[in-house]
Design a protein with these regions (language model features):
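Intracellular coupling helices
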Residues: 73-118, 178-190, 487-528
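Hydrophobic alpha-helical transmembrane segments of multi-pass inner-membrane transport and secretion
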Residues: 53-88, 167, 198-224, 467-502, ...
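C-terminal transmembrane helical bundles of large multi-pass transporters
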Residues: 440, 444-537, 548-552
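Residue-level signature of transmembrane alpha-helical entry/exit and packing/kink sites
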Residues: 57-58, 102, 107, 149, ...
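Small-residue-rich transmembrane alpha-helices
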Residues: 76, 112-184, 225-226, 523-574
Length: 574
């Protein structure tokens, strides 16, 4: 059961969770021991709605912000270079009586026009590509289909343009309008050596954007390493050749559990009669269904029948399954037996546990024959009946691909919840049997309908889609940022060479070799690049823990990533 509530003023999610646990304990005492296996959990609605999309959205937002800052730093450096060539013009304006504010206003307005033109082009590109991007976005973001480039989006774009103009244009305009530029009237050569302060400013901007590029590339590298680890992950089942669907039926017509079980059996038998079908089973919640599922507490034999005992044990992922479900999903039996016709509503309550759960509850012991009480245990006189472990199966990724859980399976005829998802293993193309499956269901119950048809391979691909999308976006942003950094370094070196033309000529006249001159000019950009790399690596190391929750199978301080990114940028800088 799911309930939605609004927190009172001054209350926190933690306080609500504590109060909800107290209510659950009181209900347990009021109803004897029949609620022992029930658990109440509290989750912020935003976290529940965003689910797997949250890390992807955070990664994209962070990459977008970093790319904007890098672009601003690059543009500011280019404006400083451009402004250096206008020193004489600005000095003449001052000599003719122009005030500093007037010059700043003119230079800033030029930058504002450039930013607005870029903003219009960006909005136009977004408008043209918006539908294609939204339709192909694999992330399950709530209300994504209602997204549009409306007045709010245009206002946000305008604010970004104005903010960018301030960040990019204000400092260069103020810098070049200083009264000290009057000295430019005395410059007879455009190749005069630049002032040390202007050179330092340009170097700081280039080093700063290079540091931001390091952080962005580090994030992209960690995401790629995480995705690689996910691709190597053993999901615990074989998705190839498996068709999944839901069965909708009239609860008025199938108003008892016995009638519903009979319908499930008939549908599975109809599927098995198809020549292409290898195995067919059903389960309460199919693997990789996301955060939605059924959680349960557990008490094992030897522990007191109280909620305090359950709190010491892990929360389990509860499933109801038909006997052939494990064969249909190719979930391997490791020990004991699978469910069969013996496991009925009137027989001894039995369960199958995942391997990790068996090790957790009974370390270094044989779990077969052990007894527990979890959700679905029958109740006799308000006292739950022990459920006996008859089998141990391989762990399967039951909810999210990133998060392993402790799996508990009940026979579908002993479970309080009806199976919902049908899994059919086919020797050929799974979708090829859909018409025959629908015809078989219609022959059993004309009012029943087959919904949610998909292959398990598509389900697995959708589970990886958010990761794949994040990597593509962050990597694209990182590549653009790397291009910006390369342009910034090249501009710095070229401008430094232009400004030192007279010095270079003197050195050449005194016998300096070409390689000496090249080394002299290149050193200007090399030391700036090394400083930016050092700051970027240090910043990435400080911020590494902020992305830990978005990673899988890789440490936030991964040595390979922290070594490869500076090496790559060092090569680009050279």
């Amino acid at each position: 059961m799911y309930a939605i509530g609004r927190l009172a003023a001054g209350e926190t999610v933690e306080n609500a969770a504590e109060q909800l646990s107290t209510i659950a304990r009181n209900e347990e005492l009021k109803n004897g021991m029949s609620n022992t296996s029930m658990v109440a959990t509290t989750t912020p609605l935003m976290t529940h709605l965003l689910g797997a999309a949250r890390p992807a959205l955070l990664a994209i937002a962070g990459a977008s912000g970093a790319l904007l800052l890098i672009a601003c730093a690059n543009a500011a450096a280019l404006l400083l270079v451009h402004g250096a060539g206008r020193r004489r013009e600005i000095a003449v304006r001052f000599a003719l009586g122009a005030r500093r504010l007037q010059v700043v206003r003119q230079l800033f307005c030029e930058t504002m026009v450039l930013c607005l033109i870029a903003g219009v082009l960006g909005v136009g590109l977004a408008y043209v590509s918006f539908d294609a991007i939204v339709s192909r976005a694999p992330i399950a973001v709530p209300r994504l289909d209602q997204a549009a480039i409306d007045v709010r989006a245009l206002l946000f774009a305008l604010v970004v343009c104005l903010g960018t103009a301030v960040m990019v244009g204000l400092f260069p305009a103020w810098r070049h309008s200083g009264a000290a530029l009057l000295a430019g009237l005395h410059d007879r050569s455009r190749s005069a050596t630049p002032t040390s302060s202007s050179a330092r400013t340009r170097k700081l901007l280039v080093a700063g954007q290079l540091a931001a590029v390091v952080v962005l590339l580090m994030a992209a590298g960690l995401f790629i390493r995480s995705f690689t680890a996910l691709l190597r992950l053993d999901l615990g089942f074989d998705s190839r050749g498996v068709l999944t669907f839901n069965l909708g039926f009239s609860e008025d017509r199938h108003d008892t559990k016995e009638k519903q079980w009979a319908l499930v059996d008939a549908v599975l038998d109809s599927a098995r009669r198809l020549p292409e079908v290898v195995a067919a089973g059903a389960v309460y919640q199919r693997p990789l269904a996301g955060t939605i599922g059924w959680d349960t507490n557990v008490i094992i034999e030897g522990q007191p029948l109280a909620s305090e005992s359950a709190s010491r044990n892990p929360i389990l992922n509860w499933e109801a399954a038909t006997p052939d479900y494990f064969r249909a999903m190719d979930i391997r039996l490791l020990h004991g037996r699978l469910f069969d016709e013996r496991d009925t509503a009137k027989s001894l309550p039995v369960v199958i546990v995942g391997q990790s759960l068996a090790v957790r509850l009974w370390p270094r012991q044989d779990p077969l024959g052990r007894r527990m009480i979890a959700y679905g245990a029958p109740v006799a006189g308000n006292i739950p009946v022990w459920q006996t472990v008859v089998g141990v199966v391989e762990d399967a990724r039951s909810r999210e691909v990133e998060a392993p859980r402790f799996d508990l399976y009940l026979p579908y005829r002993q479970a309080p919840n009806q199976v919902q998802h049908f899994m059919v293993r086919v020797s050929g193309d799974p979708l090829a049997v859909v018409p025959a499956l629908k015809a078989g269901v219609a022959a059993i119950d004309p009012e029943a309908r087959v919904d949610g048809i998909s292959t398990m391979e598509d389900v697995v691909n959708r589970a990886f889609a958010a990761w794949r999308f994040s990597i593509i976006v962050v990597s694209a942003f990182a590549a653009i940022a790397l291009t910006f950094a390369a342009v910034g370094i090249a501009t710095l070196v070229a401008f430094a060479a232009t400004q030192r033309t007279r010095e270079i000529g003197v050195r050449a006249a005194l016998g300096a070799q070409r390689r000496d001159v090249v080394a002299l000019v290149a050193s200007e950009g090399t030391w700036t690049a090394l400083a930016g790399l050092a700051v970027g690596v240090l910043t990435a190391w400080i911020l590494r823990m902020s992305v830990e929750s978005m990673l899988f199978g890789v440490a936030p301080g991964d040595a390979l990533t922290f070594a490869a990114v500076p090496l790559l940028l060092g090569i680009v800088s050279v």
